[in-house]
Amino acid sequence: RQMSRVGIVTDSAADLRPAVARELDITVVPSRIQIGDRIWMDGPDLRTPSFYRRAFASSETPRVLPPTSQQFVDAYAHLAQVSDAIVSVHMTSALDGTVRAARRARSLLGQRCDVHVLDSRFASVALGMLVTEAAKAAQGGAAASEIERLLRGLIPHTYCAFFVDSSERLERAGITVEGCSGEKWDTQ
């Protein structure tokens, strides 16, 4: 059997270190951060102490915007040149429109490449762990359908908790989920 090349894509909500993304050949499509009228691309270069000071000192609430469909089209088209298929794993659709943008990009790309878009149901470290497992499977020669099956098996057994001092900033940024105020948060 000829080994196929599967490209792995995620978004910056996976919080992957750049060295890990490079080592595992993961394409990270950046979210966008909006404060007032300015928009920045998310990523390690943006996440500096001076940016955080500016963001939290601003009277405007920072908003995280999902990547655009065009950002995904560009990433998929680039990977399609060297891949037989793409597995694109993203932040939970309960929090933002990243999965929707990725699915739209898949339809805009048409038949140029087989793209599998998965809603991880998570963000941050849990998403990063799932993406890392997908990349390791791809490097091991797994087909896209095998990687998708692996992730669908891992998702129900993955758990994530996070804590904030106050949900006020989350609510102002528009990332509130019903039942998230101090209770167990289950997006399934």
Task: Tell me what each language-model feature is.
Residues W40, F51-Y52, F72, Y76, ...:
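Aromatic side chains
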Residues A55-F56, A80, A138, E171:
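Hydrophobic residues in alpha-helical segments
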Residues R5-G7, A85:
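Residues that mark the start of a beta-strand
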Residues R1-Q2:
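Short, Lys/Arg-enriched N-terminal segments with co-localized hydrophobic residues
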Residues R5, A13-T27, S31-R32, A94-H116, ...:
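Mixed-charge interfacial surface used for oligomerization/domain docking
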Residues A57-L95, R100-R104, E148, P156, ...:
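Glycine-rich phosphate- or other oxyanion-binding loops that anchor nucleotides, phosphorylated ligands
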Residues R54-A57, S83-S88, L108-D119:
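Glycine/charged-rich beta-loop-alpha catalytic/anionic-binding loops adjacent to active sites
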Residues G7-Q71:
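N-terminal glycine-rich anion-binding loop in soluble enzyme alpha/beta folds
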